[in-house]
Regions:
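Short hydrophobic/aromatic-rich motifs at helix boundaries and adjacent loops
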Residues: 16-17, 84-89, 113-114
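Structured beta-strand-rich core segments of catalytic domains in phosphoester-bond hydrolases
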Residues: 2-78, 177, 184
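Soluble or luminal CAZymes and related metallo-dependent hydrolases
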Residues: 38-40, 103-114
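Second-shell loop/turn segments in exported
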Residues: 98-105, 128-131
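N-terminal short leaders/motifs
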Residues: 1-3, 134-135
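Active-site-proximal beta-strand elements of phosphoester/diester hydrolases
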Residues: 55-64, 91-97, 101
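Metal-dependent phosphoester-hydrolase catalytic domains
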Residues: 47, 109, 114-128, 133-185
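A solvent-exposed, charged loop/short amphipathic helix patch at secondary-structure junctions
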Residues: 73-100
Length: 185
């Protein structure tokens, strides 16, 4: 912790109920601005002074969670691994899972629209967007941020599926990083 403070002495946070979005940096944090907020989730932009005339807009996101409980994930795992054994409950549990995922997707779409609108208002500026999007690379959320003119750092530099969530037979990449043309991934 002491080494981190010595190399990155600047820190700021925004509290979203029980979640905190923050930025720890070696560059001064000029200010912060909440882009969107919904219950415990949202997006915050931190303005970092890189040098005398260059400001980075660092957008940290923790977008709406699916809201799946440990029991939901266990039922999903059972459906995937043993669909024949769960035949009677598959339809009921599938409907419940789809309902939760649908509700969360609607909220995330609005959050993604807010982040994309911010990016659009700041076109031509130095921007990095990162965080827990709780959505996959084929989602509306990912597409909306990417189509705002940013580069998907993983797609530009990595190979393979990529995964940032791996639990109960759910293996996906839901954490993402995007950058403006000022940055090379």
């Amino acid at each position: 912790l002491g080494t981190t403070r010595a190399t990155m002495p600047y820190n700021d946070t925004v509290n979203f109920s029980s979640n905190i979005l923050g930025c720890t940096s070696r560059f001064p944090i000029l200010r912060k601005e909440v882009i969107c907020r919904y219950q415990m989730n949202g997006a915050v932009v931190f303005y970092l002074l890189l040098n005398d005339n260059d400001t980075l807009r660092l957008i940290n996101c923790h977008l709406q969670s699916m809201g799946l409980t440990a029991e939901d994930r266990e039922q999903y795992h059972d459906i995937v691994v043993n669909p024949e054994e769960k035949r009677g409950g598959v339809e009921k549990h599938s409907r419940l899972l789809v309902s939760k995922i649908s509700r969360a997707s609607v909220i995330r779409a609005a959050q993604a629209d807010s982040v994309a609108a911010y990016i659009g208002r700041n076109a031509g500026k130095s921007i990095i967007v990162c965080g827990d999007f709780n959505d996959t690379p084929i989602s509306y959320t990912h597409h909306r941020i990417h189509s705002a003119g940013l580069t998907d750092a993983y797609a530009a530099t990595a190979t393979g599926l990529g995964r940032s969530f791996n639990r109960d037979a759910i293996i996906v990449r839901i954490d993402h990083m995007f950058c403006s043309s000022h940055w090379k991934p």
